[in-house]
């Protein structure tokens, strides 16, 4: 953009967002290993995705969330096996047994050709505000995981651990492609800025309402207030630059429910019993047995697994019954 006022605004807000990221990152314990962080991230995304899916009005977006949930569940399982193998730790203690640590859709079956990650998009004007919040939330979560796994490859000398981080990082990129493709491509830059700032405030408020630690609750409150200020500034920019009133985009700006990270064992078990064998094809999720022989991902998967899947190797070395499951 050649709009100097807009560039100054974005530069200042970007600096504030960077400071927020540092503050949140500093909450990770200093003695937490990358595998422990990976287990925490996968638990968070499994329970987050389950919550978003159960509060999603758009049927196709909900299907996409359910589809990826079973893949992230498998990532939690594989990282847990690796954690026990490399560090002798029990992932059930890390997760407090709130999330099932069981195999989902096998990671080795998740390698898909890039064209098979394309999805039909929703229309900005036809979905409720909660859908827009769900979309931005899951995109951010998957991006954070992908970047962390890529940077964690160097943290371990064992080849299998390094390859597992790389394998799962690639699948997270696929998830990111899927979710980004679901968004309305006609959303304007100012509309997206307003929605992103609102989404951050919404996420911090959800965290604030669900937090029991007083100090961390105070942090969520402070960050929420910052994001509300960013939101109001973004609304003013949209009105000045695009001549749009925020009410046209947001309606009454009421989001009917907050994000709640809670155990979702029953929901996950139902998905495992009905959807673990699904794959994407031609805008649908169908059983793998119904896929055509020339489905691009068949040959792609074969090439990707030609040296063996690290996720499969981890399971071979550590039987799944060694990993605890919530009662």
What are these regions (language model features)?
Residues 1-327:
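Non-heme di-metal
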